[in-house]
Amino acid sequence: SNFKGYYGYPATVCTSVNEEIVHGIPGQRVLQDGDLLSCDCGAYVEADGVQWHGDAAFTAVVGNYASETDKYLDRTTERALWAAIAALAEAGASGWKDARINLIGDAVESVVFDAAQETGHELGIVEEYVGHGIGTKMHMAPDVLNYSVSSKGVKLQPGMVLAIEPMITAGRASNETLDDEWTVVTRDGSRAAHWEHTVALTPKGVWVLTARDGGVSGLEPFGFTPTPLSA
């Protein structure tokens, strides 16, 4: 794991339950049927004295019961992640011409906005915690925002590797950190979901390094096919 000891983090994974958004510390808590659990984990391999890092997260409902709100929150967050990856795939298919990093935030925000409009329920995009570049270190430039901004950000190009990780709440996105100095929770007690993949930009598209199929199944609904690193 590349998590344990990172800035003093005490565990090998982050486990965030219900109103916990991110950086939850595993402990003795007994999970209950219907809990919403987000797991964020990372690993690295070392070659020739150089570390190469990966980072991923997913959300799942514990047990056999899930409220419709929780299921919709989870699906929306995962779809926002894949919509962002699809936006990268589209840019890559066009040779990355004039492609800028904030197309990711545009894609995430569009999915969340449409979902909120469809259901009439409030959904929040957490802005304080964002994705990042990744490679020889777990966190590298550039920041990868999950929301739209006026600036378009850095130019995208083949060879970049990005950790994309939308964190969405079923209420307001306002949050605070608990006394353990790690666990981030929603202020209004609303539940949160967190999905993440590490994505390599190839000359003609993307390859999802943390998906077993490279992103085939996730991109298929958007009409794109990932391109291997050698393509």
Q: Where do the protein language model's features map onto the residues?
A:
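Active-site neighborhoods and metal-handling regions in enzymes and metal-associated proteins
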Residues: 1-231
